[in-house]
Swiss-Prot record:
Protein name: Ribonuclease 3-like protein 3
Matching PROSITE patterns: DS_RBD, RNASE_3_2
Lineage of producing organism: Eukaryota, Viridiplantae, Streptophyta, Embryophyta, Tracheophyta
Coiled-coil segments on the chain, per record: none
Gene source species: Arabidopsis thaliana (Mouse-ear cress)
Keyword entries, A-Z: Endonuclease, Hydrolase, Nuclease, Repeat, RNA-binding
Enzyme class at the top of the EC tree: hydrolase
């Protein structure tokens, strides 16, 4: 049996496209990573659908925790091992075989669920394979989520429940257990984890107030004073069967006496069934609960808080319940060693019920009350009690008689408005009505939770099919750009969806009103108002309602929402845009006269990169991620949020749009572009190249002037007269100290644009303007402690003319550009990591500009044979300017890396503002020569016409 047939047998499903399944289990396959990326979103949505349907009353945080446990790499890796999928993987890296084998052996020894992972970390390849297979199934069943779940459901068992998560030891116990096992202590799973922790901690019982008898008698009861029936406005007949649950103390426990169990019972006061009758239809919504026993384990160890009583009072105050009533139930022991047992009672008015619980035996009354309060808090936080409370509260929130908004004319008009915006008519309009009314109801939170994941999958599917050759990292960037919170909030405002919600939107907060006001003005990508969460949730909730109404059809969901979310960003859109957070950050700081600085470090534990933002040497924010550019982006976003709160600003205007503003520095002034005396004064711009990402960010510093001066005091307007510029020194700072870049590699990186004579470029024929282009050099500072003068030798980027480097000017139009020397300074605190395929990118740039292919050559080889370093150079010939650009790269251990290094420096040089100006000016000569020839031809034709006319007149005379 081959691998494909074996996987089909495990899934109990025969694939139509067996070739795709072969790709899904082959690590070196070009489709493997793409399928894994697709499958991750698919399984997340499948579990989201299941969890929301099974646990309709859980809060969003609980839903997220439950989904995270079920879609984690640890869970998926265990599924692969338990179903022997790892035997059929075609792995590329032999070292993975050992990791998979060790993990499989560890999983075989596990007896209980381990949502947080076991002792051996799961190899990611196992989880990736399961996700890849899931994507293959999803494609094979024509993108049907329901059919996928039917096939995968048995494979994904056991599905973790809220109780499974509650039974897991807290992180301190889990960490302690793993630490003990690492040093040779007993290594078992399940409840013995807590036992091991107990034994170790009890050695220090002098410093911990822990008694084994604390576990006795944990019980509470919920007493309802009258029977109740629950109503719902749902039009669909839904039947979920759950059972009555009882929490019973195990009487066989050696440390628990039978009388301790008496009356300590949690019971729901219905013997068999809890029926929920709908008020609008006769469809019964029935929950059947089977009896379950909850046994108190004597080895279960907990350390109770010192102020549990105060915390319980705070919970009651927050929920607007009466204060809890504490009382002493009994006193035990002799007078010199008394023992107290306390009880607490909580009355919840809106369900007309009472929670009552007895606590542990303690030597002091205060300790007994704190212990009791601790157990009551744990009980209130349990999923069972949350279910009971939410169900008991449902009649008042869902009772149609008490909620006239559901049938008001305002509600009907709101439903019609939303349907008109979506261009979609709901089958179940009650679903939309509930959404428009209840912001904090479980239904609203469930719709929001489902909608967010469904939209993400819809875009993932769209991008997967639209870009068949795109790598997962690029697909992820595109998906995030199209499903980000900013975009959701903008859609909610622009399309007017937020105006249709009646009860969902509370009194607008300042952030919401500011965002809506800003969106009412013309769009500005450099705003600093963060998207309010309430607006994001509204759109996600609408998406969830549509997704359920179209019967979980992802494709139909995208068809409905695509018009709202236009424009759909493409990869070209993202490449053309500067990274907005950096631009916003620098402009926000510059507006207030501040200077922004990024500093970098490593997290020793996780080995992640940390980026920190400083403003005038004062720490503002930080970001942490595996990639340094991601960490920097996170830090910039956090800094923008913090600075925008303390720096009142409505918009950050793009610097290029400041046409009508007058800026004065000294005696110079910048007048509007509509006046003739034109003197423009701008601040020096410092261009910083980031270490990892080669994106360019602009800092504006008030250090030097960039003036536009004319030869005469009066000139024509800008529309008639292209003006020359005199550019003062601009520093371009690159990263120097990088874990992947050696110090000697950055020595002597320089290039110069060489011209044998002063180049004069004719600019316009109407105005006497002369631009003189002087020689420019970008040189490493020789006084730097890491740069030796000899290192600059031969490392030259030069633009040399093959025939003539002197550009002629027109005698009647002397216009001169003067450019001063610029220094490129290497910043030792900014690391730089070169990409892997810069050589290919350089070839693409040359092809795009219709230049000949770049020529790579090995310039020198350094070091000994076992530690050899290679230096490569690259040369580009640009025919239309009759010039050649030449640059050397860094010393690298392999020829491929050396070529990529030289290509990287060439690309950065070509993208710099100075080089763009030089190439443009050099190309301008050819264009201007053509214009001059055309003008001369026109003048010649005019002369000929005049001559002909004069000849004709003479003949007539």
């Amino acid at each position: 049996m081959n691998s494909v047939e074996a996987v089909e047998k495990i899934l109990n499903y025969s694939f139509v496209n067996k070739t795709l399944l072969k790709e899904a289990i082959t690590q070196k396959s070009p489709l493997f990573d793409r399928l894994e990326f697709f499958g991750d979103s698919i399984l997340e949505v499948a579990f989201t659908n299941y969890i929301c349907h099974t646990y309709p009353n859980l809060k969003v945080k609980e839903l997220r925790d439950l989904r995270t446990a079920n879609v984690s790499n640890e869970k998926f890796a265990r599924i692969a091992v338990n179903h022997n999928l790892h035997h059929f993987l075609l792995l590329q890296n032999p070292s993975l075989f050992k990791k998979v084998k060790n993990f499989a052996e560890a999983v075989r020894k596990e007896d209980d669920p381990v949502p947080y992972g076991g002792l051996v970390k799961a190899p990611k390849i196992l989880a990736d394979t399961l996700e890849s297979i899931a994507a293959t199934v999803f494609i094979d069943v024509n993108y049907d989520v329901k059919r996928l779940w039917e096939i995968f459901r048995s494979l994904l068992e056991p599905i973790y429940t809220p109780d499974d998560l509650l039974l897991q030891p807290k992180l301190p116990f889990l960490t302690l257990f793993r630490l003990a096992d690492k040093h040779g202590s007993e290594s078992t799973s399940g409840i013995r984890k807590m036992t091991t922790s107990t034994k170790i901690l009890l050695r220090n019982k002098d410093c911990l107030d822990v008694d084994l008898e604390d576990v006795k008698g944990k019980s509470f009861e919920i007493c309802s004073t009258e029977l109740f029936s629950l109503s719902t406005v749902s039009e669909n007949s839904l039947t979920d069967e759950m059972s009555q649950e009882e929490v019973v103390i195990d009487e066989d426990s050696p440390n628990v006496e039978p009388e301790d169990v008496k009356g300590k019972l949690f019971e729901i006061c219905y013997t068999r069934k809890l029926q929920i009758q709908t008020g609008s239809s006769g469809n019964p919504l029935t929950y059947e609960m089977t009896t379950k026993q909850m046994v108190v384990d004597k080895d279960s160890l907990h350390v109770e808080p010192v102020n549990g009583r105060g915390e319980l009072i705070e919970i009651c105050t927050k929920n607007k319940w009466p204060r809890p009533i504490f009382s002493v139930q009994e006193e035990k022991g002799p007078k010199n060693e008394p023992k107290f047992v306390c009880s607490v009672k909580i009355e919840i008015p809106n369900i007309e019920g009472t929670f009552h619980m007895k606590g542990d035996i303690k030597s002091k009354k205060k300790q007994a009350e704190n212990s009791l309060a601790y157990h009551m808090i744990r009980a209130l936080e349990s999923s069972l009690v949350s279910l009971v409370i939410s169900n008991l509260q449902k009649p008042k929130s869902l009772d149609e008689k008490n909620n006239p908004l559901l049938f008001s004319s305002e509600m009907d008009s709101s439903v019609e408005a939303v349907e008109k915006i979506l261009n979609y008519s709901f089958v179940n309009k009650t679903l939309l009505k509930e959404l428009l009314t209840h912001n904090n109801s479980p239904l609203f939170q469930g719709l929001m939770f489902v909608g967010e994941s469904a939209l993400s999958l819809a875009f993932t599917k769209h991008l997967y099919l639209t870009y068949p050759m795109l790598e997962p990292k690029d697909l992820s960037v595109l998906r995030d750009a199209n499903t980000c919170h900013d975009k959701y909030a903008c859609v909610a405002v622009k399309k007017g969806i937020y105006q249709s919600f009646i009860g969902s939107v509370p009194k607008p907060e300042k952030m919401t009103t500011d965002f809506i006001e800003l969106m009412g003005k013309e769009d500005d990508p450099y705003r600093v108002v963060k998207a309010p969460k309430i607006l994001v949730n509204l759109l996600a909730g609408v998406a969830g309602a549509v997704y359920i109404d179209v019967k979980y059809n992802v494709q139909r969901l995208l068809e409905i929402f695509r018009v709202l979310l236009e424009p759909i960003y493409t990869l070209d859109d993202l490449r053309m845009q500067l990274k907005q957070p950096f631009l916003m950050l620098f402009r926000l700081a510059d507006k207030h006269g501040k200077q922004i600085d990024f500093r970098y470090s490593k997290d020793g534990g996780s080995r992640k990169n940390i980026a920190q933002v400083y403003m005038d040497d004062m720490f503002i924010a930080s970001g942490c991620a595996k990639r340094i550019d991601t960490a920097k982006l996170l830090a910039a976003e956090e800094a923008i949020q913090k600075l925008s709160e303390c720096m009142p600003i409505e918009k950050i205007i793009h610097q290029d749009n400041l046409d009508g503003e007058v800026i004065q520095t000294g005696s110079s002034s910048l007048l509007t572009a509509f006046e003739n005396p034109l003197t423009e004064e701008m601040t020096q711009e410092q261009m910083v190249i980031d270490e990892d990402s080669l994106d360019v960010e602009w800092k504006l510093f008030e250090t030097e002037e960039l003036q536009i001066q004319t030869g005469s005091s009066s000139m024509s307007t800008v529309s008639e007269n292209p003006l020359p510029c005199e550019i003062t020194p601009t520093k371009m700072v690159i990263g120097e100290v990088s874990p992947h870049v050696e110090l000697e590699d950055v020595k002597g990186k320089s290039f110069e644009i060489s011209s044998t004579e002063t180049s004069s470029l004719p600019i316009a024929f109407e105005n006497p303007l002369t631009n003189e282009l002087t020689q420019e050099q970008m040189v490493i500072d020789e006084n730097s402690p890491y740069v030796e003068p000899v290192d600059t030798k031969g490392k030259l980027f030069e633009s040399c003319s093959v025939e003539s480097s002197s550009l002629p000017t027109t005698s009647e139009n002397p216009s001169t550009y003067e450019m001063t020397t610029k220094q490129m300074v290497v910043d030792k605190d900014s690391p730089h990591v070169e990409p892997e395929d810069e050589k290919g990118k350089l070839f693409e740039i040359c092809a795009k500009n219709k230049w000949p292919n770049p020529i790579f050559s090995v310039e020198e080889e350094r070091g000994q044979q076992n530690e050899q370093k290679i230096v490569c150079s690259v040369k580009i010939e640009i025919p239309n300017i009759e010039g050649t650009f030449h640059i050397k790269g860094d010393a690298k251990p392999t020829k491929k890396e050396a070529e990529n290094s030289s290509a990287d420096h060439m690309i950065r040089a070509l993208e710099s503002s100075v080089m763009s100006l030089v190439i443009t000016n050099l190309q301008m000569h050819e264009n201007l020569d053509g214009k001059k020839k055309n003008l001369q031809m026109k003048e010649s034709l005019n002369e000929n016409k005049t001559l002909l006319h004069s000849t004709k007149r003479r003949r007539r005379l």
